[in-house]
From Swiss-Prot:
It catalyses: 4 Fe(II)-[cytochrome c] + O2 + 8 H(+)(in) = 4 Fe(III)-[cytochrome c] + 2 H2O + 4 H(+)(out). Keywords: Cell membrane, Membrane, Translocase, Transmembrane, Transmembrane helix. It comes from Mycobacterium leprae (strain TN). This is Probable cytochrome c oxidase subunit 3. It is a multi-pass membrane protein. The lineage of its organism: Bacteria, Bacillati, Actinomycetota, Actinomycetes, Mycobacteriales.
Length: 202
C-alpha cells in the first residue's frame, strides 16, 4: 500500500515537473528576440539623434503617404491575431486549422511587404533617398531592416507550412509554430513603434 502511494506520488511529481519545465527552444527564441530588441533600440536612438542634430524642419520635405501606410499597418496588426489563431489550432493538434490561419497570415505579411515596397517607390520618385538627407538614411535603415525581418518571418511560415504538409504533425512542429508566432508578434510590435515615430512624431 505504501509503495503504491509512493509510486503514485512520484508519478504525479514527475508529471508536474514535466509540465512546468520550460521548452528550451522557446526560451532560446525569447533570448534571441531580446537581442533583436536591442538592435532596434539602436535604430530608434539613431533616428532621434539625427532628428536632434537636423536643426531645421523634421522631417524635411517628403511625401510620406499616411493614407496608404495606415491600411498596410492595420493588415500587419491583424496578422498577429490570425497568427495566434494558428497557434491555438496547433495546441489542439488541429493541423488543418494551423495551415489555414498561417496561410492567411502569410498573405497578410506579403501584402505588408508589397505595400512597403510601393511606399519606397513613391518616396524615391519624389526625391527621398538614402543619400538625399539624414532623414532618408535613418528612414530606409529603420524600415528596411524591419522589412527584412518581416520577410524572414514569411520564409519561416513557408518552411513550417511545408513541414506540416510533407510529414505527420508532431509536437515538435507545434512548438515550431509557437516559436514562429513569437517572432511574428515581435515584428508587429516593432512596426507599431516605428509607424508611430515616423508618421506621427514630427
Amino acid at each position: 500500500m505504501t509503495s503504491t502511494v509512493g509510486t503514485l506520488g512520484t508519478a504525479i511529481t514527475s508529471r508536474v515537473h514535466s509540465l512546468n519545465r520550460p521548452n528550451m527552444v522557446s526560451v532560446g527564441t525569447v533570448v534571441w528576440l531580446s537581442s533583436e530588441l536591442m538592435f532596434f533600440a539602436g535604430l530608434f536612438a539613431m533616428y532621434f539623434t539625427a532628428r536632434a542634430q537636423a536643426g531645421g524642419k523634421w522631417p524635411p520635405s517628403t511625401e510620406l503617404n499616411l493614407y496608404q501606410a495606415v491600411p498596410v499597418t492595420l493588415v500587419l496588426i491583424a496578422s498577429s491575431f490570425t497568427c495566434q489563431m494558428g497557434v491555438f489550432s496547433a495546441e489542439r493538434g488541429d493541423v488543418f486549422g494551423l495551415r489555414r490561419w498561417y496561410v492567411i497570415t502569410l498573405l497578410m505579411g506579403l501584402f505588408f511587404v508589397l505595400g512597403q515596397g510601393y511606399e519606397y517607390y513613391h518616396l524615391i520618385t519624389h526625391g527621398t533617398t538614402i543619400p538625399s538627407s539624414a532623414y532618408g538614411s535613418v528612414f530606409y535603415l529603420a524600415t528596411g531592416f524591419h522589412g527584412l525581418h518581416v520577410t524572414g518571418g514569411l520564409i519561416a511560415f513557408i518552411f513550417l507550412l511545408a513541414r506540416t504538409t510533407m510529414s505527420k504533425f508532431t509536437p515538435a512542429q507545434a512548438t515550431a509554430s509557437i516559436v514562429v508566432s513569437y517572432y511574428w508578434h515581435f515584428v508587429d510590435i516593432v512596426w507599431i513603434a516605428l509607424f508611430t515615430v515616423i508618421y506621427f512624431i514630427r
